[in-house]
Amino acid sequence: MSLHIQGTERTPEVQLMTDPLSLKIQGESFPEDVAVFYGPVITAVNALSLAPKGPLNVSLAMVYINSSSIKALYRIFEGVDAYRKTGNQVSVHWNVPEDDDIMEELGEDFKDRFPELDFKVGHHG
């Protein structure tokens, strides 16, 4: 199941690709209705566990994210972790802009909450 949501001023671009299996979320995230925006993403990620297809690479490059979106990302990571529990390798790359301590701390917080994931927090230019 592939999914592509074009990014806007208020929402990130989301790409879930099946060959190779990857999830990419990048941009700002403060949608008017978090449930409407992230609902299809959460559903698609949860569906991955029903028919595992090998390693999953997750890449996030968030510029800004509000508290409601953080909760939605937590649910996405729950789905990603459930996929890992099916016996598949999962790698997560939380890409942080230089000098963005808030986004770096948020990435580290997610890393701590999901210790079984291969979760890396790093800077990009």
Predicted regions and their residues:
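STAS-typified acidic loop motif
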Residues: 2-39
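Short low-complexity stretches enriched in small and charged residues
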Residues: 11-19, 45-51, 76-77
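Structural motif
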Residues: 22, 56-57
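Short, well-structured hydrophobic secondary-structure segments
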Residues: 30-50, 54-55
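Amphipathic alpha-helical interaction surfaces in cytosolic regulatory modules
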Residues: 38-41, 57-110
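A glycine-rich helix N-cap at a beta->alpha junction
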Residues: 115-122
